[in-house]
Swiss-Prot record:
Skewed-composition ranges (Gly residues): 71-84, 147-160
Biased composition (Polar residues): 708-747, 896-905, 987-998, 1433-1448
Tissue: Arm and ena colocalize with Abl at adherens junctions throughout development.
Compartments it resides in: Cytoplasm
Gene source species: Drosophila melanogaster
The protein, known as: Tyrosine-protein kinase Abl
Boundaries of every Protein kinase domain copy: 371-627
Any single Pfam family the record assigns to this protein: SH2
SMART domains assigned to the protein according to its UniProt record, in alphabetical order: FABD, SH2, SH3, TyrKc
Record PTM Phosphotyrosine, positions in chain: 522, 1497
Length: 1620
């Protein structure tokens, strides 16, 4: 759209330039017009070219108008560069469709306004204004060339006025406004011009129109009001800030005064091609610049002044005034010197709010600056379409920029009001509008696969079988039936106006626009885009439209679908269509089209409208067209057939989607399907979308029921969309970002959320690598004799990706990423990855779980109409699905264990036994360090596989992930790395970091949903939905356990499945310890899930590992924390955004908040004592927890190091046996249990760890009691994260409390826990963690240093706790560095992330955990950087690590803390916890930092950390910073064009870590004051650059090369400064 708009605008501006340099509307400005060579309008004939340059559409539309129109439009456009962009098009249109007279009239109206207020500050009023200008310009241009700009403008304006209301013209910007001849009065000091519309509120007030000129005679005492006399003779008071002197620059909509370059870039980030502003330099007053956006980047042009006072940008064109210069450059022409014409003035930020533009602010009105435009997706009749990010929620949305002349703003607003009420799963949901100033935006949900026409043409018969086509047609009929029931006429139904999401979900789009178009626009005129071949005969003959004419169009659409996107009436000229139809001709039956379908087409093509069927009957016919089976069933069959060949999951998905609830159930095939089905029922279309990939979800269920089905699903993934998904999933890391966009129809780019990835900087790289590994692994899994599992996983992966992708990007991202990574990382990588999906979805039954979760996603999707909302819903559903999944899991225990667990690993005995250590490690890694992208991790995993030591560490990391996933079970799995096969799966599950994914989704989705539709689920989809979705307490856990089906299997899985009767997840206050939500939508949810897992783990939570349960709860918490952090890092935006709204709080509701407060208070009270406990509860802090235990154990085994977590693990083991006892156990979750020694090899260590965790609190006194204390802390955190969870836990008593804490923890405890974990990680995993954040290189280093890890481990052992805390700090490290980091850091950080969730872990997520404690935001970043550095250092010297840890801890703990990195207090706390042996636990309670939860995202890590430990701050040593600098410099050596979006985020995170480390260093370092000042300047620059890097993925290569060069320069300067 931007380009198109640019063209149009260019044309407009060109027109304006030629015709109306003076008059923005084409009114006045003949001089300018003539001056501007590119004034398209200037020369009627020439104008075409300018127009062409600026407006292809306009040119075509205006063809009839011919040069005149073109020029008119051009001039209008030029005139209203910004405002007229739209109008210009209409000008073209109008000219084409309207006679010049109309244009003139419209223009005249506009002109009058212009003349009245010569300098229209914001002329961009309506799209029409631009068109007016265009038309007027056209006429004017000829005149204007002579110089009769004003006259022409007026005449044109007159013509155009009819079309364009003054209101519109007022909103339209045209450069001509700037050119309006000043006239004699310009110098009159009393003449003012209105900047905004003002609606008089009283008798004595005077209403103003923007651009209107008034004479100001006096002011009131306060100066807030002034007495204005209008030209019409009216007198009244107007607000003084609504008017500005006529001769001031402020009157111009494009003049922003003294704002900084950065502020200008920020303002323009929400613009499109041609958005611009003129600003004055802050540093050198009087020096002005033009800031212009083009193709995603902002260009700054200095405005020079020559000795004669003339201003110019290029020597060739000099002007007397700034307005003339702007006008000249707003008209497209050769050699104007700017990269693109100036089209849309950026909205001013300081608009007075006292008098809003409209009496009541529209809830649908979105602040333009909340929208960050990314790239153009295409252009259409109404304008261009962009992919954008809604920054408030981090959601990917589609933005349509409306061409101003296409429709009247008033009509558009009325229509938008109707669109806002249209909510149906098969209608694209309106999210909001930007109508304050042009360009006008319509913001809708994002559909990843674009329009149906292109989809049909690109897919072909191999991918889309008849069932899929019928399914899509049915969805369209469903959406149109809804419109019909609302008496709504679409008027432009065609394949090009339907959008495709994942799983073949189809939605009707543009249903609100056709009617909005001016009547004349929809009158066939030469060159107009009138859909003749889709229009019913009565529409062609009499321009009559009705729902029956939409039915005719549907018949043509059916034909398009049947022919895979052929153009209708082939070989028939447009002009002959009507005559042929009149003679009875109808298109023949397409080859391969079933007669029933063709009969339906022919019914739609009845000449008499009354003979045509209704959409309701059409929908019914399509649903029941074949063999008395519903279309859903038919589709399902077809898909299943395909599935066998292509991907069974796909068919089931389609079945689900199509069937609506019923079909879904069928597709679900089994318990999962039934629950899912219900959900999908309501959300049929959406579900379908997800469902198709959901087919895979179905497949998992099928797997439960039928291994063959499982296999079938695999094939599906292999072929067709599923296969794509599969591949995508495997390559998810790469495409994750896009996946999020829903671009991956097949789930290709599943949502590797760049943000989330950013947390683990190397995760992206990992992802890339992982892709191959993932594929290899998939094969491997099959090889592992886990064919079913592999397939399951594949389908799951695909399905999950696709599911999350559209509706729950975050979910998908997290899941996809972690899964992807998991796959790569885990030896049974393919299974693992897929397992992760499955784990993500159904804790126990990997395959099943994931699928069900995906079903949920699709499920959710339908619930949330808006895309954003959908995501939230999806997330919700995903959780539900998982729950369902759990239930179904039991049915096919054996199969489920296979896929359910990483079951592949388990199933594959060879893997189970032989690669147990590696698998466990991988699992842990997957779990703990859910690197967003599987690729990197995969690569690292491969490396890890080589070294069992590394492998063991990995498992530890994996555990943290499960919490993210909200799979208590996974945590158990990671706790039980012993059960090699299962642990990997579980790890995978964790790794899925469904929690993270969901989290982001939930956060973003929920918020969005809340905003657009109030959905209980929407508010906290994860919580209630999750709970509702699966009655089993812990859907994920359940899923795991269920998937296992048999408790023993669960044990194999590494975590006994929670009893199905487990109380609902903590999400519900009353529910027993609910299982962690399968994929908590928000970090909080993830945390909660983990907490639940932990609690249940403590009391044999649903983890499915009795033993694991205890530890698991802790681990889960940790995991969750990492998840949260991961989520935030992956979806940095989402988490942060959520932070403000407290993820769980919003989800849980106010009661949880109270609980939260209580918890916080309790935590504070228990602060030091309980901090460790809370850490434990978090499970992150408590390495003791299963994951840690697992990690430690595995690490110990691998590295022959003593592991502290055996105790917990043992417990977990017990838990395994007591899967059914979960509930009770949950309740039992007593600190004792937690502290109960895990009989495992290193029970003492575990205990110590536990104590250490407690200690972290400041008291190592409660080894047994800690569980409750942690619970409390966790609850407090939970309160932050999940109030509901907290309440629930409270009710459940210590068990619940503990659970809540776990969840909460994550935010609070996460801080401490994270710190602890970090310490542990620092000890052993720190290396990995830090590295993890660092970069691929750091990851490599980490890996390479993994062997040193043992040394670290020693240090860790000395902080065995830390090791445990890390959940296997070493494992974390061993994980891919990213993963490792995530594991440890994430564990640590993971917990922190809960808190951190708010913060933006992306920058340096792993470190944040330590940070978290100190100060969520700053510490985290520092922590990460420190960690990064330390980890690298650590390899070389454990002591160093200790020092790093020290950074975070008090002086006593400083040596250890240093390892932590830069987290101040949090770090210290963590470290202390880590060094459980160290009696001098930091005095700083981890809990206190909980409040920082929100701060987590805060950048000022340094400050936060400072308080935590200034002494330790100094710990951030010169060497560690230099090492980090070296790492970063290595990362920057890659060619810019080879760096993916996720890698940019990782770079940004690493840079942020460096920034935090430097801040701390500067604070505490021995530097002379002047050096310190310069150093801080440098560091501030680095911080800004890290922010720029975050958006580098959407920028062009030149920008990024420049940015990378700047970063490299900054890094060199930092190293120079440090070396001085």
């Amino acid at each position: 759209m931007g380009a198109q708009q640019g063209k149009d605008r260019g044309a407009h501006s060109g027109g304006g330039g030629s015709g109306a340099p003076v008059s923005c509307i084409g009114l006045s400005s003949s001089p300018v017009a003539s001056v501007s060579p590119h004034c398209i309008s200037s020369s009627s004939g020439v104008s075409s070219a300018p127009l062409g340059g600026g407006s292809t559409l306009r040119g075509s539309r205006i063809k009839s108008s011919s040069s005149g129109v073109a020029s008119g439009s051009g001039s209008g456009g030029g005139g209203g560069g910004s405002g007229s962009g739209l109008s210009q098009r209409s000008g073209g249109h109008k000219d084409a469709r309207c006679n010049p007279t109309v244009g003139l009239n419209i223009f005249t109206e506009h002109n009058e306004a212009l003349l009245q207020s010569r300098p229209l500050p914001h002329i961009p009023a309506g799209s029409t204004a631009a068109s007016l200008l265009a038309d007027a310009a056209e006429l004017q241009q000829h005149q204007q060339d002579s110089g009769g700009l004003g006259l022409q403008g007026s005449s044109l304006g007159g013509g155009h006025s009819s079309t364009t209301s003054v209101f519109e013209s007022a909103h339209r910007w045209t450069s001509k406004e700037n050119l309006l001849a000043p006239g004699p009065e310009e110098d009159d000091p009393q003449l003012f011009v209105a900047l905004y519309d003002f609606q008089a509120g009283g008798e004595n007030q005077l209403s103003l129109k923007k651009g209107e000129q008034v004479r100001i005679l006096s002011y009131n005492k306060s100066g807030e009001w002034c007495e204005a006399h209008s030209d019409s003779g009216n007198v009244g008071w107007v607000p003084s800030n609504y008017v500005t002197p006529l001769n001031s620059l402020e009157k111009h909509s494009w003049y922003h005064g003294p704002i900084s370059r950065n502020a200008a870039e920020y303002l323009l980030s929400s613009g499109i091609n041609g958005s611009f502003l003129v600003r004055e330099s802050e540093s050198s007053p009087g020096q002005r610049s033009i800031s212009l956006r083009y193709e995603g980047r902002v260009y700054h042009y200095r405005i020079s002044e020559d000795p004669d006072g003339k201003v110019f940008v290029t020597q060739e064109a000099k002007f007397n005034t700034l307005a003339e210069l702007v006008h000249h450059h707003s008209v497209p022409h050769e050699g104007h010197g700017l990269i693109t014409p100036l089209l849309y003035p950026a909205p001013k930020q300081n608009k007075p709010t006292v008098f809003p533009l409209s009496p009541e602010p529209d809830e649908w009105e979105i602040c333009r600056t909340d929208i960050m435009m990314k790239h153009k997706l295409g252009g259409g009749q109404y304008g261009e379409v962009y992919e954008a990010v809604w920054k408030r929620y981090g959601n990917t949305v589609a933005v349509k920029t409306l061409k101003e002349d296409t429709m009247a703003l008033k009509d558009f607003l009325e229509e938008a009001a109707i669109m806002k009420e249209m909510k149906h799963p098969n209608l694209v949901q309106l999210i909001g509008v930007c109508t304050r100033e042009p360009p006008f935006y319509i913001i809708t949900e994002f559909m990843s696969h674009g329009n149906l026409l292109d989809f049909l043409r690109s897919a072909g018969r191999e991918t889309l079988d008849a069932v899929a086509l019928l399914y899509m047609a049915t969805q369209i009929a469903s959406g149109m039936s809804y419109l019909e029931s609302r008496n709504y006429i679409h008027r432009d139904l065609a394949a090009r106006n339907c959008l495709v999401g994942d799983n073949k979900l189809v939605k009707v789009a543009d249903f609100g626009l056709a009617r909005l178009m001016r009547d004349d626009t929809y009158t066939a005129h030469a060159g107009a885009k009138f859909p003749i071949k889709w229009t019913a005969p009565e529409g062609l003959a009499y321009n009559k439209f009705s729902t029956k004419s939409d039915v005719w169009a549907f018949g043509v659409l059916l034909w398009e679908i049947a022919t895979y996107g052929m153009s209708p009436y082939p070989a028939i000229d447009l002009t002959d269509v009507y005559h042929k139809l009149d003679k009875g001709y109808r298109m023949e039956r397409p080859p391969g089209c079933p007669p029933e379908v063709y009969d339906l087409m022919r019914q739609c093509w009845q000449w008499d409208a009354t003979d045509r069927p209704t959409f309701k009957s059409i929908h019914h016919a399509l649903e029941h067209m074949f063999q008395e089976s519903s279309i859903t069933e038919a589709v399902e069959k077809q898909l299943n057939a395909n599935a066998t060949s292509a991907s069974s999951s796909a068919p089931s998905t389609s079945g689900v989607a199509t069937g609506g609830g019923a079909t879904t159930t069928t597709a679900a095939s089994g318990c999962a399907s039934s629950s899912s089905a219900t959900a999908s029922l309501s959300l049929t279309p959406q579900m379908v979308k997800k469902g198709l990939p959901g087919g895979q979800a179905l497949t998992p269920n099928a797997h439960h029921n039928d291994p063959h089905q499982q296999q079938a699903s695999t094939p599906m993934s292999e072929t067709g969309s599923t296969s794509t998904k599969l591949s995508t999933f495997s390559s998810q890391g790469k495409g994750n970002v896009q996946m999020r966009r829903t671009t991956n129809k097949q789930g290709k780019q599943a949502p590797a959320p760049p943000k989330r990835t950013s947390l683990l900087s190397s995760s992206r790289d990992s992802t890339y690598r992982e892709e191959d590994p993932a594929n290899a692994r998939c094969n491997f899994i099959d090889d592992l004799s886990t064919n079913g599992l592999a397939r399951d996983i594949n389908s799951l992966t695909q399905r999950y990706d696709s599911e999350t992708d559209p509706a729950a990007d975050p979910d998908t991202d997290a899941t996809g990423d972690s899964l992807e990574q998991s796959l790569s990382q885990v030896i049974a990588a393919p299974v693992t990855n897929k397992m992760q999906h499955s784990l993500h979805s159904g804790g126990g039954g990997g395959g099943i779980g994931p699928r069900s979760s995906q079903q949920h996603s699709s499920f959710k999707r339908p619930t949330g109409t808006p895309v954003m909302g959908n995501r939230g819903l999806e997330t919700r559903q995903s959780k539900r699905s998982q729950l369902h999944s759990q239930a179904p899991g039991p049915g096919p225990p054996s199969t489920q264990p296979h896929h359910g667990n990483n079951g592949v690993v388990t199933s594959a005995h060879p893997i189970t036994v032989g690669a147990l250590d590696v698998m466990n490690v991988k699992q842990v890694v997957n779990r703990y360090g859910t690197l967003p992208k599987g690729a990197r991790i995969g690569a690292y995993l491969d490396s890890l596989e080589d070294s069992s030591e590394a492998a063991p560490a990995l498992p530890a990391t994996a555990p943290s992930l499960p919490p993210a996933n909200g799979h208590a079970t996974p945590p158990a799995a990671r706790l039980n790395p012993k059960a090699s096969p299962i642990p990997p799966q579980q790890m995978i599950r964790s790794n899925s970091s469904g929690g993270v994914t969901m989290q982001n989704n939930a956060a973003a989705s929920l918020n969005k949903l809340q905003r657009h539709r109030t959905t209980t689920e929407g508010t906290m989809m994860t919580f209630s939905s999750f709970r509702a979705g699966g009655s089993s307490s812990s859907p994920k856990r359940s899923a795991s356990g269920v998937a296992s089906g048999v408790q023993p299997a669960l044990a194999n899985l590494e975590f006994p499945p929670p009893p199905l009767d487990l109380p609902p997840p903590p999400e519900e206050f009353e529910g027993g310890p609910p299982p962690p939500p399968p994929a908590p939508e928000s970090a909080v949810q993830a945390i909660q899930q983990h907490l639940h897992a932990q609690l249940p783990n403590n009391g044999n939570i649903s983890n499915g590992n009795g033993t694991n349960n205890n530890d698991s709860s802790h681990n889960d918490v940790s995991n969750i924390a990492p998840s949260v952090e991961e989520a935030s890092s992956r979806f940095g935006v989402s988490l942060r955004k959520r932070e403000p709204s407290t993820d769980s709080c919003s989800s849980l509701g106010s009661p949880p908040e109270d609980l939260k407060e209580k918890l916080i208070t309790e935590i504070k009270a228990a602060g030091k004592d309980t901090a460790p406990a809370s850490h434990l509860a978090n499970g992150s802090g408590i390495a003791v927890v299963d994951p840690v235990s697992l990690l430690v154990t595995e690490l110990a085994e691998s590295m022959n190091l003593p592991k502290p977590p055996p105790q917990q693990q043992q417990k977990l083991t017990n838990g395994n046996s007591t899967g059914s006892g979960f509930k009770a156990q949950l309740k039992k979750v007593e600190p004792k249990k937690m502290s109960a020694p895990m009989p495992k090899a290193e029970p003492a260590n575990t205990i110590i760890d536990f104590k250490a965790h407690l200690r972290r609190v400041d008291k190592e006194k409660e080894p047994a009691t800690p569980a409750p204390a942690p619970a409390t802390v966790a609850v407090a955190n939970n309160a932050n994260c999940n109030t509901t969870g907290t309440l629930n836990r409270k009710e459940d008593g210590s068990k619940k409390f503990s659970q809540a804490m776990q969840k909460t923890e994550i935010k609070i405890d996460v801080t401490n826990s994270n710190v602890e974990a970090d310490a542990g990680a620092a000890g052993e995993g720190d290396l990995g963690k830090r590295r993890s954040t660092g970069s691929i290189n750091s990851l490599k280093k980490l890996w390479e240093q993994q062997p040193p890890a043992p040394d670290y481990a020693t240090s860790t052992i000395l902080q065995q706790q830390p090791s445990v805390v890390n959940g296997g700090g070493t494992p974390n490290a061993q994980l891919s560095p990213k993963y490792g980091m995530k594991s440890g850091a994430i564990n640590t950080v993971g917990t922190l992330p809960a808190k951190l969730g708010n913060k933006q872990p992306p920058a340096a997520p792993p470190p944040p955990p330590p940070n978290c404690t100190t100060s969520n935001s700053s510490t985290t970043s520092i922590s990460t950087s420190s960690r990064d550095c330390t980890s690298r250092q650590q390899a070389s010297s454990t002591i160093k690590t200790s020092h790093s840890t020290q950074l975070f801890t008090d002086d006593e703990e400083q040596s250890h803390t240093e390892g932590l990195g830069s987290g101040g207090q949090g770090s210290a706390d963590m470290t202390q916890s880590l060094y459980e042996q160290k009696p001098q636990i930091q005095q700083k309670p981890a809990v206190p930092h909980k409040p920082t939860k929100l701060t987590i995202y805060a950048t000022p890590i340094a400050k936060l950390t400072e308080p935590a430990s200034s002494a330790s701050s100094t710990q951030i040593s010169r060497e560690s910073i230099l090492e980090l600098v070296g790492l970063l410099e290595g990362s920057l050596k890659h060619p810019v064009n080879a760096i993916a979006g996720s890698q940019w985020l990782q770079l940004s995170d690493k840079l942020n870590i460096l920034h935090n480390s430097c801040v701390i260093f500067a604070e505490n370092g021995a530097m002379p004051p002047h050096s310190k000042f310069q150093f801080r300047e440098l560091v501030t620059r680095v911080e800004a650059q890290s922010q720029h890097l975050r958006s580098a993925g959407s920028k062009n290569v030149q920008d990024n090369e420049r940015l990378v060069a700047e970063v490299g320069q900054s890094l060199r300067q930092i190293s120079n400064a440090l070396n001085r």
